[in-house]
């Protein structure tokens, strides 16, 4: 494998593994900023070593073990938290006895809980929505500050500052690295879903720049939504959001004409709609319905989008059902935009 191919592989591995790597480290260290820094250190070492040694059989486990060693080195240098240092030393010794199996357990066993903690921490309500979005894409999406800046068409230093300030705010406020419980989870989940949907919308209908759409952001939001749905299978509104994004994303190829101008929904060539994404969206919507309870705004919007997706032509659209769904949506989230669409 050439150096270029190895670097491409490392980039792909990072996109896949970075979120749970950071999440696992944050669980141990209780410091999201330090966890990301150590994960980045492990990435740098991989970039230095893998072109010579080859990509390991379990690259995620290799990165986790390397990051843990960096954590031990750092604690040894700083002579802080000696008890935690000893704990990490014992853990590393155990991994050396059975590196592959222990590293896999570190990644796979607590993966769900760790990732949920990271999601809820990155989207904490004390952060501005802009900060939540930047931190989420950085920690969970595996994007660099440059990639985030280019996606939102803002200077890279601006994104970097948002991320730095967000991590400082979390540390200063001593935000607990945990999944919220009880009634708090409803409000906190709204914050998470809002951040993911904002990323999707910025890709679906860009608010800046010359391009009407930025598909990369839509893909990042969909990936995050699908992961969250897998981690919270009993949360109907998570499935509602995933259904909404899947169905909306299915129209991407039909939304722009040859000149780059938007095409209204009723004028789109429905043969260009992605039936696979529509199928996924309808399945997510059905899962939300099966879970029962009062439908939230995302599930309602997904149900409206499904009415359009099921119609072979604009003339076959079930406008009666759409009107009824908008009436319910207006009660759940009253807003001028909803009333305008309802009219």
Explain the meaning of each model-derived region:
Residues 13-32, 45-49, 120-124, 205-208, ...:
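Amphipathic, Lys/Arg- and hydrophobic-enriched alpha-helical face
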Residues 22, 29, 43, 167-174:
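C-terminal flanking helix
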Residues 2-23, 33-36, 186-194, 198:
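A short, charge-rich alpha-helical start-of-domain segment used by transcription regulators
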Residues 39, 50, 75, 152, ...:
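DNA major-groove recognition helix of helix-turn-helix
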Residues 43-44, 57-86:
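Σ70-family region 2.3-2.4 aromatic/basic alpha-helix that recognizes the −10 promoter
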Residues 17, 59, 162:
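Residues within the DNA-recognition helix of helix-turn-helix
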Residues 83-130, 138-147, 154-327:
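Amphipathic helix-loop-helix modules that constitute alpha-helical solenoid scaffolds
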Residues 25, 35-46, 63-66, 166, ...:
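Short, small-hydrophobic-rich alpha-helical interface motif
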């Amino acid at each position: 494998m050439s150096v270029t191919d190895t670097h491409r592989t490392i980039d792909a591995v990072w996109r896949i593994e970075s979120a749970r790597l950071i999440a696992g480290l944050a669980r141990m260290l209780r410091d999201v900023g330090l966890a990301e820094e150590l994960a980045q250190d492990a990435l740098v070492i991989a970039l230095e070593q893998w072109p010579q040694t080859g990509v390991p059989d379990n690259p995620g486990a290799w990165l986790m073990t390397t990051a843990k060693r960096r954590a031990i080195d750092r604690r040894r240098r700083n002579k802080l938290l000696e008890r935690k240092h000893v704990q990490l030393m014992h853990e590393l010794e155990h991994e050396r006895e059975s590196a592959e199996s222990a590293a896999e357990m570190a990644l796979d066993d607590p993966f769900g809980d760790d990732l949920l903690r990271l999601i809820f921490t990155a989207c904490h309500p004390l952060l501005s929505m802009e900060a939540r979005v930047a931190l989420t894409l950085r920690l969970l999406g595996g994007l660099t500050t440059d990639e985030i800046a280019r996606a939102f068409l803002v200077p890279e230093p601006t994104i970097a500052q948002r991320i730095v300030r967000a991590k400082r705010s979390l540390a200063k406020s001593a935000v607990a690295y945990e999944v919220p419980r009880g009634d708090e989870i409803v409000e906190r989940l709204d914050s998470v879903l809002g951040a993911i949907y904002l990323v999707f919308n910025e890709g679906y209908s860009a608010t800046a720049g010359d391009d009407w759409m930025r598909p990369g952001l839509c893909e990042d939001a969909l990936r995050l939504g699908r992961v969250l749905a897998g981690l919270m299978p009993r949360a109907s509104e998570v499935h509602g959001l995933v259904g909404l994004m899947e169905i909306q994303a299915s129209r991407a190829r039909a939304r722009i004409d040859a000149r780059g101008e938007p095409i209204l929904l009723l004028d789109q060539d429905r043969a260009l709609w992605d039936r696979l994404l529509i199928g996924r969206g309808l399945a997510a919507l059905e899962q939300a319905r099966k879970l029962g309870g009062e439908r939230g705004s995302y599930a309602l919007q997904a149900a409206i989008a499904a009415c359009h997706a099921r119609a072979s032509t604009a003339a076959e659209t079930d406008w009666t059902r759409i009107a009824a769904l908008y009436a319910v949506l207006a009660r759940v989230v009253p807003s001028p935009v909803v009333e305008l669409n309802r009219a």
